[in-house]
Amino acid sequence: MKKESLDFCYDGMFKDKRIDNRATRLLSDITNSGTVTINRCCPTHKERIGAYRMLNNPQCCESALSEALFRSCHDNILSRHVLCIQDTTEFNYNAHIDRIGKDDKGIGPITKDSHAGFFCHPMLVVDPLSHLPLGISALKLWNRDWDKKNRHERGYQHTPMEEKESYRWIECPAKSLFQLPEDTIQTIIADREGDIYQALCIIPNDRTHLLIRSSSNRKLEGEDCLLLERMSSLPIQAEYEIEIRGHDSRKSRTAKIALRFSGLSLARPHTCPSTFRDALSINCIYVVELPQTVPQGEEPIEWRLLTTHSVDTVEQAMECVNWYRCRWFIEELFRVLKSQGLDMETAQLESGSALKKLLLIALPAALRIMAVKLGYDSKNENIQAGLYFSESEQRCMRLLHKTVEGKTIKLKNPYRTYSLPWAAWLIARLGGWAGYESAAKPGYITIKRGMDTFLCKYDMFKMMENEFEQIDKKAPT
């Protein structure tokens, strides 16, 4: 991926040029303020009124805002292969239901039936080499009806696939391919919820590969064993170590992983219509943590990855494993949109439609925060800061380094000037990170706080820069 910048705007997306300008301005306000709350992100009363009116204007439609996302993603792709990561999240507005009202057609029950909100299923496009986000190539927003019947009442097993919510796992890859450059191949990555036999049959084509984590211990065609038994019986092809970050139910550690892989044939489940093929040939990569590094009381790290990519060598298998590890990025995107970033669930609008449109405008801002964090983590100095920051912003960064660098080498920015890790180091320091390489890596809250601080300082820098330009123009020659 090599491009001068990943700029985003809404030029030409709406019939009314004023909506183009207003949407671009609101995105800028969200990016600069680090929040989607209109009363906090818009600097003046006039801007706030304009934002509310736009979000409630039927001419500012979800389809045009989505198309702007897809157009930007298309323009950012310069490689022949991209990773397309899909997953689902929900936005909970139960705290605001009195303002919105249960009769609003844009809001409905979410996972917890008594809570109100809507669902979002995006396709995040990631460059397979730099591991940086390029944009969103497909997206589905929807809400359930309050009077929707349960699975038993609806006869879920007999409902056509196209009418099920799970059809999103098939629908979005097709829409994603349509939005990509014609010579670009996509690898669809999904967690266990995407392990649907119909999807495994329908999605692959000349430009679409699959890399799905298996959820079912499936039956195999022509064999007396199930998938897990078959993969466990194979000889270990390689062993390697990975660093595991701890959380509530998992300890931090260096895990030793065993790698196995094989081609196999999945048998059609009895719940799948007979119109689908009886057996499906696919490759499986099985990675499991060896017993010696599994802490007592914990389950081992274990992935069974189903893929249409060729897996004949350890190198090919490891490449697929590393691609699948990028699936975590979409979880991080959801966190940036919510409590660790833009606080989308605190937005105080009066309709589900307006909230969905606000989410579509907030996505590019979330991607920028995410890219800065990943830019620091990658430490890849070949990635230019100019991908995500303007020349003026980079000049401001150069000046701000004097305020955050220490006197010792350990507190100097170690990265090449104007590289993305160089910019991310500054942002992290402005967010309160200690700056030492031995310190814990800055997280999203630190990066988001640093972006807020930087953009506040940049506003002053830009104002002074413009003022000096005016003085220079007026100065006698």
Tell me what each language-model feature is.
Residues M1-D104, K112-F119, L124-T477:
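Single, function-defining residue in the core of a domain
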